[in-house]
Amino acid sequence: MKDIKVTDSVKYIGVDDHDIDLFESQYVVPNGVSYNSYVILDEKVAVMDTVDARKTDEWLANLEEALDGRSVDYIVVSHMEPDHAASLQVLAEKYPEAQVVGNAKTFNMIPQFFTFDLEGRKVVVKEGDTLSLGSHTLQFVMAPMVHWPEVMVAYETSEKILFSADGFGKFGALDADEDWACEARRYYFNICGKYGVQVQNLLKKAAGLDIEIICPLHGPILKENLGYYIGLYDTWSKYEPENEGILIAYASIHGNTAAAAKKLAEILEAKGAPRSEERR
């Protein structure tokens, strides 16, 4: 298991996938991707999401190491997409006493993916509901279409952790040495980009929470300078530019259009355009 610390009571049990060629069968991920999952160890134990079926065995080994002989009381399902929920049935059958936590839409979707019996095991939550684990309490915030209709996030009130589902995610395995913003930007616009209104709704809800740690389902755990990450999400979801300027995009077979584009850039700069950039 990766030695990644969230807090003393919250353990990272996710896995990296360097074997994947295309994320969701369409997005190139040269540095792989991480499937993040977490476990909260308190009087009650809660597993926060599962992982893709490609990595079930490795993930279960991580979970068992973190549990150190304990059992699971709650399985929290924030997102039903298979890269986060594919191992749900395996986990539910391994710990048959564990209750499954989700919203009404979650439980409408589970039978479409799995065959295990949910009778007597459902904890249905809605906006603002809480779940006490002992000294830790989860507060649930609905985040529909960020980026599936059943998505919800959870805020742990004692350690001020936001389990943000696909929000604040990033392409790239956790051992990738790369800038956060570049691959987070590409992830955002491919996965959540058309749901700007819904992301704005979530950001407004998050503004009322005292967040010190963000635990996404892809990419690194965020502990410092959270205003930077939240600010980028605010900009992206408003479809505003990160930097003021003018993009001149062109294709030029014989070089004439290129010359015209460069001349246009010179004119714009002379008129005080803050920045111009050529793209061929």
Please annotate each region the language model reported:
Residues 48-50, 72-80, 100-103, 162-165, ...:
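Active-site neighborhood of phospho(di)ester-bond hydrolases with catalytic His/Asp-centered motifs
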Residues 278-279:
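Conserved small/polar residues in nucleotide/adenosyl-binding loops
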Residues 215-242:
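Short N-terminal or domain-adjacent regulatory/targeting segments
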Residues 43, 54-101:
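Active-site metal-binding motif and surrounding structural segment of the metallo-beta-lactamase
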Residues 3-65, 153-156, 160-164, 246, ...:
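Conserved beta-strand hairpin/beta-sheet module of binuclear metal-dependent hydrolase folds
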Residues 4-8, 102-224:
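Metallo-beta-lactamase
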Residues 261-275:
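Short helix-loop-beta junction
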